[in-house]
Amino acid sequence: MIIIDEISLVSHSLFQKVNKRLNEIFEVSDKSGVYFGNIPVLLFGDLAQCEPVAAKQVFWRAPGETFSLWSDLFRPINFNINMRQGEDRHFFDILCRMRLGMSLLDFNND
C-alpha cells in the first residue's frame, strides 16, 4: 500500500507522474486500465490548506480530459469532528476561519 499524506501539496502533474512511474516499475501498460502499478493508494490531507507551489491542484481537470485519476479513482471520506481542539471551542473557531482564509479582524473574542 502506498500512503500519501498532505495530498493538497501534490500537484496534478506530479500525481500523474507517480501513476506513470509506478506503472513502469511494476510493468503495467498505461492502456491496461490499471493505475498506480496495481498498488492500493491511500491519500490524506485537507484540500483547503496549502496548494502546490506554481502548479495546478491534484483535483484539477484539464480541458478535454476524459479521465481523471483524482475524481474517477478516489472517493473522499470527510471527517467532521475535530479531535485535536475539541475542548477549546474558541481556538477551534479561529483555526477554522484561518483554514478557509476568512478574516480574524471581525472575529468575536467572547
Task: Go through the PLM ranges and name each one.
Residues 1-110:
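Conserved ATP-binding/catalytic motifs of P-loop helicase motor domains
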